Amino acid sequence: MIFSNFYELISMKIEDAYGRLLTESQMTDDLKEMAQELPTIEKQNGRYQCFRCGSMIDQKLWKLSEEVLYCRACIQLGRIRSDQKLYAIAQQDFEGQEVLNWKGTLTSYQQEVSDGLIKAVKEGKNALVHAVTGAGKTEMMYQVVATAIKSGQAVCIATPRIDVCIELYGRMKEDFSCSISLLHGESDPYFRTPLVIATTHQLLKFYQAFDLLIIDEVDAFPFVDNPMLYKAAQNAIKKKGTPFI
């Protein structure tokens, strides 16, 4: 389920719901007053599609009754059914802060890439960084992440693999002074922070949450050629947000 245990459900603060995609069972009356209602399952060209994960619904097998469909593809996140709604509470800006502790130096080439990423964010353009292992991709994104957080924006760095996610979290904790959430299948409950480190599957739990979404190792399993995770990334970024890969 999206909330991995009972403690997370009862302890969630309202601000922790900002930018999250929530099911009917996760809502309280207070949250519903603030939330935007979204469809669970939409009809597209005569077929039914899950709003959360984008999967096409098997109308013969994925049904609770003759009138009610559900999505089996993302049921591990909490069952959604066609006679209910999904809910999203708009993400709010953070208080801007200086967060970069890293004192290292980029090479001229790395600095050129770093400057290009900052420019892309300012211009609202997508960017692709392709480099071999050990080329310093992580350090090259430090300045654009710090710039976004200084502006009060929400940033997520997502990667397909849990081990990479955990390693990246450890490095960012040393080099950034802000609070950071780590999200994967076995992580602690989510709390709202300006910087989130997550596996790409965790993006299914967000809706228009991030101003800057960086997907690391985009060519790795299980992200590559996975329409569900492409849909998750599409949903997780704000309409005017910037995706990097």
Give the role of each language-model region.
Residues 122-146:
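Walker A/P-loop
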Residues 153-154, 179, 192-195, 209-212, ...:
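Loop/turn-to-beta-strand initiation segments
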Residues 171-207:
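Inter-Walker segment of RecA-like/P-loop motor cores
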Residues 153-161, 183:
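Conserved RecA-like ASCE P-loop NTPase motor core of nucleic-acid helicases/translocases
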Residues 102-125:
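N-terminal pre-P-loop "Q-motif" helix
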Residues 204-244:
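SF2 helicase catalytic motif II
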Residues 39-93:
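Interdomain "pre-motor" coupling segment immediately N-terminal to P-loop NTPase/helicase cores
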Residues 1-57:
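A broadly conserved sequence feature marking short terminus-proximal activation segments
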